[in-house]
Amino acid sequence: MPVIKSAMKRVRTSEKAAARNRSQMSAMRTSIKAFEIAATNNAENANELLQTAYSRIDRAKSKGLIKANNAGRKKSRLAKMLSK
């Protein structure tokens, strides 16, 4: 554990940020998996789930959790999966 007051505060803030980031990434992965299951089963709500997945991916990109190319690649793969 750090002894310096500012270092202790940095530990607290970094733990909070890590929890926020973990939550965002988990939500993104969950929505992607839900869409993939719906797409493979030709479910009727696949378009809704695709929009949700796009939203989660864009949010993760805007928060700096994933890079722009990574987000684009994920979205492209999901769109390709829907078209098949």
Swiss-Prot record:
Signal peptide: none annotated. InterPro entries: Ribosomal_bS20, Ribosomal_bS20_sf. Belongs to the bacterial ribosomal protein bS20 family. Pfam families: Ribosomal_S20p. Coiled coil: none annotated. Binds directly to 16S ribosomal RNA. It comes from Pediococcus pentosaceus (strain ATCC 25745 / CCUG 21536 / LMG 10740 / 183-1w). GO terms for biological process: translation. It comes from the Bacteria. This is Small ribosomal subunit protein bS20. Keywords: Ribonucleoprotein, Ribosomal protein, RNA-binding, rRNA-binding. GO terms for molecular function: small ribosomal subunit rRNA binding; structural constituent of ribosome. Residues 1-25 are annotated as: Disordered. GO terms for cellular component: cytosol; small ribosomal subunit. The keyword DNA repair does not apply.
